[in-house]
Amino acid sequence: MEKGLLLESVSYQYDANAAPVLKEIDIHVPLGEWVAVIGPNGSGKSTLAKLLNGLLLPTSGRVTFNGMSTMDEGTHWEIRQQVGLVFQNPEHQFVATTVRDDLAFGMENRGFPREKMIQRIEEVSIQVGIDHLLDEEPHRLSGGQKQRVAIAGILAVEPSVIVFDEATSMLDPQGRKDVLETMKQLHENGMTIISITHDVNEASQAGRVLLLEKGEVMLDGSPAVVFHEQDKLEAAGIDRPFAYQLQLALQSRGIQLEGALLKKEELVEALWKYKSSN
């Protein structure tokens, strides 16, 4: 049995007369990995996200988590608990009038004892930095705060995987930075992260990147490997991370920096080393 999420020859179409949105894709995401999924609009990214926890069921093929199939009614809700999904618009996930009650909602549905609910609310609110917002109305919060509340609501039910479906796309720069930092911390603590994103700078933070185009996996590898594939990226209309573009521009002017520098911090460090040795 493959641990983690496994998609085997998965295809999906929204109705019988429509073209497939996903075409016989095979993906394995082991537990503990951080995978970013990039691709142009209409490539099937959000459909993939909904297939991962059974919100959608494959037209053909199989989606499993730790051997449990999303098609099996007996394990469907267990998969939903283990594979949480954070949407682009967090307001669609709010059901209560205070943050505290919203965090409690998922646990109540799953029959958590009251004592454990109180404990989990305290733990996850501190973990994502919203403990000072517990008595606030979710709809009055900033975009970044709303996303962190949505993340905390997923964390409260103790999942193994969190799927972020364009979770930073509607946020301002500070909100995006806060949510990305939360992703990093969750991954460092052992959480499996799948980030569906159009932001290549966000994708460069992951340990693995998938490029989807026209419902097929065109690239699958480390950020350094994927973002080196200029022709395939350009064909899909995907830019490279800013730091890598700048590195290539510097190289064209004779400034050679080692490795593929995908993050701003890596580029700054490499430039300091270059300056000190020249």
UniProtKB/Swiss-Prot annotation:
Binding site for ATP: 39-46
Keyword Cell membrane: yes
EC number: 7.-.-.-
EC class: translocase
Similarity comment: family membership: Belongs to the ABC transporter superfamily. Energy-coupling factor EcfA family.
Function: ATP-binding (A) component of a common energy-coupling factor (ECF) ABC-transporter complex. Unlike classic ABC transporters this ECF transporter provides the energy necessary to transport a number of different substrates.
Record-given protein name: Energy-coupling factor transporter ATP-binding protein EcfA1
Lineage, broadest ranks: Bacteria, Bacillati, Bacillota, Bacilli, Bacillales
